[in-house]
């Protein structure tokens, strides 16, 4: 039998079970169900699943490693017993097992009954693969349906504690299950490059990385390579006990080259030297801020953050905005200074870490291996601060972040001293932006080269023609013009239509752009909230392409760009309040609600389940239309409230402009 790729989902009730499968590479749909009155497909289902397991078929799901595959394996492993049981008995036992799984996962020490390596079917979990089980990226299938503009954000209309007694209930449950399968299939297709990479890595290194998140890939492969260097099995490397630290004296970990010339930065260094850190509480261990040359800079135990007042900063014939970033800043701080977790062989760790960096430079960026080495380089820093990682050592984390802040501050100061008329705009973790006279670019580059020599780090430089700066985390940058041949220019316009394009006397030119924070709108990670994307698009087009918001917004015919998404949770319910013929009705919504602001509709708010406190979703007198189910119709019939969106866009533009309005120039 030929190996196949399936996407699947299950539904479990006390008297009903179903599994729906759809081919990834085709539209083959298979449904099995167990019900005491309608159908009992148990025998056929088990035969099919075991046959597919022998063929090496792969089963994709959403959170399937923790739930769906567990129930399936339970049904397979109990085949001998279940073949002689009635459908109602099979359903009830599957339902009881399902409930035990769901409630068990609330306990910290809970382990699923069937480890992945013992399961009959080869599984890939797109939930874990995309790291949506991480609190910072936490996302349900319904939330991802919203963020990828799925046509139907469908919740079950039947309680999972109910009994399925009618044909209508069965059809409704199957419809719900099919929608989940088809939306999961879209996630699989969107993740195909990530899946292919994990398949290749699993095959190459004989490690199961099929559902591995990026940090897990980094952890497993670092252990693999380090194990080879130390002649140890990766499991033994990961089992090495981490070094217990009771405190970290910052004065003992500051690099010798960190020195300053001016009183304000000398004081910053002295402030750091007095700090003693509790390794168990690094988040709130230290905070310090300074105001220098119009920039408030915040220091802590993470990255440096500094920003001038909001405004639109533009290069002129006399002035240029320089942007400089440290190449692989955090990895190279560890590599160049031969830092390692305290419990690992320092030389072996440093050599291996540097090997990843040097090997990556030899590999083309399009090669997936380049991406893998980048993952390892960047994730290692984060893993040094992860108690569950074999690389855990908070002192290493603090060495990197504190010396990173101080090293970048040295560059900031050196530029300010060498070019007194320079205007600092921003410092952010691994780089800085500065306005300098065009005739001082050579001096700027000399200062940067001197800093590189002192720190043994490398800088990458570019130029902006415009920086729209709301704050350090939210900005739009327009790079300087770059010239390419006509064919490349045409291809660039097709692949990056939002860039700026011109035909200048010097040739065919384009200006790339970069959007951060609330101004991002392109290629957003699926876990991110994309609410009312039309706002960030309109702001971008106003500042970058000189298109008025009222003109842009009327040309955008993508209804999803006008939609927002709101989550209900264990604390707050989402409610829709409608008034019809003077009578008010309140409807509790499901976990995820997609909506847009309309001229007619209902109010939406969140209500605290215990106190009854009301929080408006969109403050004011605005009303919304719920849009969980896509409805195609002439665009004007959506009845969009353009006034709301224009007010939000205008507010964003005014916020980004600030009080500065290019007055520097």
What are these regions (language model features)?
Residues 1-20, 27-29:
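Entry/capping segment at the start of metal-dependent catalytic domains
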Residues 3-12, 123-126, 322-324:
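Two-metal-ion RNase H-like nuclease active-site motif
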Residues 16, 67-71, 132, 331-332, ...:
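Short catalytic/ligand-binding loop motif for oxyanion handling, primarily in non-cytosolic enzymes
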Residues 29-142:
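Conserved DEDDh/DEDDy metal-dependent 3′-5′ exonuclease domain
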Residues 137-138, 158-168, 288-413, 417-420, ...:
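Helical catalytic core of nucleic-acid polymerases
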Residues 143-154, 378-383:
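Glycine-rich, acidic and aromatic/proline-enriched surface loops and short helix-turn segments
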Residues 147-155, 161-327, 414-439, 443-452, ...:
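Conserved "right-hand" nucleotidyltransferase catalytic core of DNA-directed polymerases
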Residues 243, 249, 286, 292, ...:
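C-terminal, non-catalytic extensions of nucleic-acid polymerases
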